[in-house]
């Protein structure tokens, strides 16, 4: 799983590939269609698609003469699970810190109240 995640995150490190993934989330597209808005060759886009494909983020199919690129949703479930695990750990750390700070604030208030009463 970690090796697969490494490939996914490495593939998404490139802004052009992230943009392609965002576009594919809206609809399937051919390599030529994906290349249209960019100032790069179709061959360069093909190489980017290959990286995304190797990471399991996309797959190509054949529909008559078209070879549309599809986004693979299951990889996003894998990434979400990984992120969620660490998000929960961080939230727990912040909760403990909040509890500690609240306890110190109560302690300071108690000390101030005792000092004022003297």
Question: What function would you assign to each model-found segment?
Answer:
Residues 7:
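Interfacial catalytic loop of ABC nucleotide-binding domains
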Residues 11-16:
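Short helix-coil-helix linker/hinge
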Residues 49-50:
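Short, hydrophobic-biased segments on the C-terminal half of alpha helices
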Residues 1-4, 23-37, 42, 54, ...:
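C-terminal regulatory/oligomerization modules of transcriptional regulators
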Residues 62-68:
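Short, Lys/Arg-rich nucleic-acid/phosphate-binding segment
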